[in-house]
Amino acid sequence: MAKKIIGFIKLQIPAGKANPSPPVGPALGQRGLNIMEFCKAFNAQTQGMEPGLPVPVVITAFADKSFTFVMKSPPATVLIKKAAGIQKGSAKPHTDKVGKITRAQAEEIAKAKNADLTAADLDAAVRTIAGSARSMGITVEGL
């Protein structure tokens, strides 16, 4: 028989830097989950990733105080800013352009995000990433 699910917890945690301080501790503590067990498991799974890269995670909490978690790919905006070499997007995205990425860079981001995107094919995924980039004030060359 399947375990009874008592809730889902969605967090964004920097890769390799999960610790019991907020937001992780309070979110897991409310459900009575073992915070250190989660932190150790999360840090072990994100060991190969770039340190500090925000990783969305969905934690499923069960009635017996156990849990499972699923990691998603990093947010597209973070990957776009990294590819463009900027710290933040434009305050006026459609008038002030703050950076550029190429179609090849957009394709790399689309491939990394493919599991989390609802696009039918790679070209549609690239257009989705290009739209996100444009709304951040970044031009996409080759589109």
From Swiss-Prot:
SMART domains the record matches: RL11 (SM00649)
Protein name stated in the entry: Large ribosomal subunit protein uL11
Quaternary state and interactors: Part of the ribosomal stalk of the 50S ribosomal subunit. Interacts with L10 and the large rRNA to form the base of the stalk. L10 forms an elongated spine to which L12 dimers bind in a sequential fashion forming a multimeric L10(L12)X complex.
Keyword Membrane appears in the UniProt entry: no
Function: Forms part of the ribosomal stalk which helps the ribosome interact with GTP-bound translation factors.
PANTHER family: 60S RIBOSOMAL PROTEIN L12, LARGE RIBOSOMAL SUBUNIT PROTEIN UL11M
GO cellular component: cytosolic large ribosomal subunit
NCBIfam families named among the record's database cross-references: L11_bact
Native species: Ralstonia pickettii (strain 12J)
Residue ranges that the Swiss-Prot or TrEMBL entry lists as coiled coil: none
Post-translational modification note: One or more lysine residues are methylated.
InterPro entries on file: Ribosomal_uL11, Ribosomal_uL11_bac-typ, Ribosomal_uL11_C, Ribosomal_uL11_C_sf, Ribosomal_uL11_CS, Ribosomal_uL11_N, Ribosomal_uL11_N_sf
Family per record: Belongs to the universal ribosomal protein uL11 family.
A GO biological process held by the record: translation
TM annotation in the entry: none
Pfam families associated with the record: Ribosomal_L11 (PF00298), Ribosomal_L11_N (PF03946)
GO MF terms held by the record: large ribosomal subunit rRNA binding; structural constituent of ribosome
HAMAP family reported for this sequence: Ribosomal_uL11 (MF_00736)
Keywords for this protein: Methylation, Ribonucleoprotein, Ribosomal protein, RNA-binding, rRNA-binding
